[in-house]
C-alpha cells in the first residue's frame, strides 16, 4: 500500500538543535543568512532514511549542502548524515576532510554490489541518513539512477526528498515518501513533488527527468 508524499514541518533558517555542531552551526547559519539562502528541513527527520538531493548540476551543490548540514544543526552526529564516494576520494590529500564531513568509500568492484552494501550498512547503524544525488553526475543524463530507490527498498527505509533551488536561494528538504514497490507510481509522485515546489538547480538545463533507464 503506497503512502503519498507527506509535507513535513518547516524549520526556520539557522534554527539549531542542542549539542550538535556548537559554534560551527551558528557560523554556518549566519553565513547562509548573510548570502541570502533559506533552509527548510523536515523535522523530525527519520532515524534511518535515504535523502535525495536534486538536481545535482554543479560543484556548488556540495558546498551548499555542507553548509546546510551545519547550519540547521539537526541532532545527530556527522557520521549519521552520510554520503558515499568512489574509493579514490578517500586515498588522496582530501581523504580526511571527506571522512570528517560524513563521507565513506564504496567498493564499486565488490561482488555484493552497491545496494547490498548499503542495506547492510543501514542494518548495522542505529541512525543513518544517507544522502545521494539521483543523477550520479553533474552532466545531463536522460534518466536518474535507480540506486536511491533500490537502497530504500532493500533497507526498508523511507525516502526524504530535498532540492537545491538556486534562483530562489533556498534548500528544501521537506517531504517523505515510503516506497510502495510500484516504481512508476512512486516516480510520478516524486516528479510531481519537484514540479510543485518549482526548484531549479544551478544549471537547470542539466537536470535529469524522473525516469529510470
Language-model region placement:
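Short linear sequence motifs
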Residues: 30, 186-187, 205
Amino acid at each position: 500500500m503506497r503512502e503519498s508524499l507527506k509535507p513535513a514541518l518547516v524549520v526556520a533558517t539557522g534554527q539549531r538543535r542542542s549539542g550538535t555542531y556548537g559554534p560551527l552551526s551558528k557560523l554556518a547559519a549566519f553565513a547562509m543568512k548573510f548570502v541570502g539562502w533559506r533552509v527548510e528541513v523536515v523535522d523530525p527527520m527519520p532515524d534511518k532514511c535515504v535523502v535525495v538531493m536534486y538536481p545535482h548540476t554543479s560543484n556548488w551543490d556540495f558546498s551548499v549542502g555542507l553548509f546546510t548540514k551545519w547550519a540547521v544543526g539537526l541532532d545527530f552526529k556527522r557520521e549519521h548524515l552520510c554520503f558515499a564516494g568512489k574509493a579514490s576520494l578517500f586515498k588522496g590529500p582530501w581523504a580526511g576532510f571527506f571522512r570528517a564531513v560524513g563521507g565513506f568509500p564504496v567498493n564499486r568492484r565488490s561482488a555484493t554490489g552497491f545496494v547490498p552494501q548499503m542495506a547492510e550498512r543501514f542494518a548495522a547503524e542505529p541512525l543513518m541518513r544517507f544522502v545521494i544525488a539521483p543523477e550520479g553526475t553533474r552532466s545531463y543524463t536522460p534518466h536518474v539512477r535507480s540506486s536511491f530507490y533500490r537502497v530504500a527498498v532493500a533497507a526498508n527505509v523511507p525516502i526524504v526528498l530535498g532540492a537545491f533551488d538556486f534562483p530562489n536561494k533556498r534548500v528544501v528538504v521537506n517531504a517523505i515518501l515510503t516506497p510502495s514497490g510500484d516504481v512508476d507510481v512512486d516516480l510520478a509522485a516524486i516528479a510531481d513533488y519537484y514540479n510543485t515546489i518549482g526548484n531549479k538547480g544551478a544549471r537547470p538545463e542539466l537536470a535529469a527527468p524522473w525516469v529510470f533507464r
